[in-house]
């Protein structure tokens, strides 16, 4: 036989048969080797044809394997290595296969011709085929359903058989099988798609919209309507095939192979005479798909059929990709009719989630509260700004359900703690068993008593946990069964099988519903007892997931955090001394935000801190970050002195297209995208170029900035603090005797501020806070704070440091300058106190666990160790 007259798959099967014979130490390749290799290929044509005939493939394969084992094997010195003979039976089989190819007017001998030749085989294979009722007639019948009226004109024809099943999914069949979730709403878009599909020409809708708004769901909704026959007469009995472009392209090694596959798909659709609607998700992938030098891409192959109306195609793609790929090819674009899929509102999303609720409950085996559904829609809309409804809300519910599900499957915390304690005591028991002294024996007895008690508790808890798990799984299984029966009822009613419908509606379904109700009531009764497992998804779980995703504290305040927030003003005052007004205004803004009564479309608070250097402006921002997030690292600090040139503005929001660094994003916008809940400190704003403030206007008013990539960055959960030294000279000179700022000084400072910044900028700031110069008493408090920080650094060596009143007076006198604030004081303590301590520590005069007193003698600071 000429191998060139065989298809690639037949050649591969013969080669595999040779390898099989060698592995079994056979001297010849026979028909049974070839049969076994054809059955070995899972996705092969032989397997597909036998599946159509309802043949048990595994049993047939075992039968063939049994025949192979009967063959004599030759090993040892008598075996001729590398020599294989083809039996006369196999040669005759291939000759018969050639005749079958001629009968079917095919150019090459394909796998189906070999199978037809097997049906005329005598001996063991004939008996095997008879056992499985495989005859030439029923084989030909199955072959026609797989192959249709195609001829074998190439060496790889198997790739073009059942092309749609191989390279696509039947959405209507999936709906019937209950694999697709229900589609709620979207009626106007589905109606528009139906109208376009009912046109004579250009009947190809393309769904365009943002990612996650439900474009694919609209097509699934159409498939559900087709199943329910809730479509016009022209669309009844249609089927929707979702084309998998990646499967089409994958493995197409040679030129023309991709085109051959796609042509096979298109021919099947053409032959269906409009019965098949082709759905291409990510439509932009057809532009350039399979394009190599001199070849056509998928888009150009589709155009003629689209224009003639031979191909009903539904596309779906995002706005950006439609603009980038489809609009650039006007000939392709004009063949599609646009259907814009808008993002649903929060109310619509709540309806969608209510429709999906039962599917999630069945899948995860949990109960979802309606409050959780409302929370998922509202919180995702407010806090997750870079994604779209309903996708982000569905993800929240799904993850919250998964969290509860993993808790159900994992060991409860209480039981885990008891089990670990038992393990710990068992280790101790083994160790004490080796000791012979009286004390160890007494401890062993006590330990064994405790161990037996704990084991009893653990076994009780384990039994309770298993029972609770069993109850939850029982409810889940009943729900799944009920859903299956409802699907069967729908199918029976659709097929007018009234007997089956009556049996389901009045017999099986009420019985399962009754059983489910009893199981749920039992579960509700058990819930009143102290349960180990929880199966409810509430708004707290949703809020936890939002907090985990975004870092924004959305969950209800726990007691510790509530106390911390109420004491926020006091906490800030401990670190920022002498600036009561500033501390009060900032803490009030944070309280309003956490109580949920702030304007949701503006930042938590925006402040301008004015005052001389070293009075606590930057320190307050750091303290706020530390108090809210337990870390000063959560503060986004931008030194505005770096933005003195006009072009430096682009560094905040990213370079415009065409400039170096366009892909990198802006320093401010990228930082906030990663930490949406943070304190933003714009230090020394008067140093920045006036153009910078134009960018800040939207941030202060609407809580958002659009960066150079066109992404909207959300500032609604940030505290914006801007510091400036404007008017500090007036503040230094204009103090009352009680330390407050004179009214005329305040007016002078505000006048200078208005002269430097535009009214539209100042008008958007919540509060302009004047920091007053520090008085001597406040400076003493700062000295205490500096010493406390020093003690913190020495805490691991258990060394305490104390300054006498005289030493404090001396430090204040020598180190404080009203013009420079508290910073010189810190430097003075560093130079005079810390240096002396360091010298004594290195000399080992001060040892661990010492108490150090700093005093004044002969007009200088001295260190005494006690």
Curated annotation (Swiss-Prot):
Residues 774-866 are annotated as: C-terminal. Residues 6-71 are annotated as: Repeat 1. GO terms for molecular function: ATP binding; ATP hydrolysis activity. Disulfide bonds: none annotated. Keywords: ATP-binding, Chaperone, Coiled coil, Cytoplasm, Nucleotide-binding, Repeat, Stress response. Belongs to the ClpA/ClpB family. Residues 86-149 are annotated as: Repeat 2. The Clp repeat (R) domain probably functions as a substrate-discriminating domain, recruiting aggregated proteins to the ClpB hexamer and/or stabilizing bound proteins. The NBD2 domain is responsible for oligomerization, whereas the NBD1 domain stabilizes the hexamer probably in an ATP-dependent manner. The movement of the coiled-coil domain is essential for ClpB ability to rescue proteins from an aggregated state, probably by pulling apart large aggregated proteins, which are bound between the coiled-coils motifs of adjacent ClpB subunits in the functional hexamer. This is Chaperone protein ClpB. It comes from Bacillus cereus (strain ATCC 10987 / NRS 248). SUPFAM superfamilies: Double Clp-N motif, P-loop containing nucleoside triphosphate hydrolases. ATP 1 binds at residues 209-216.
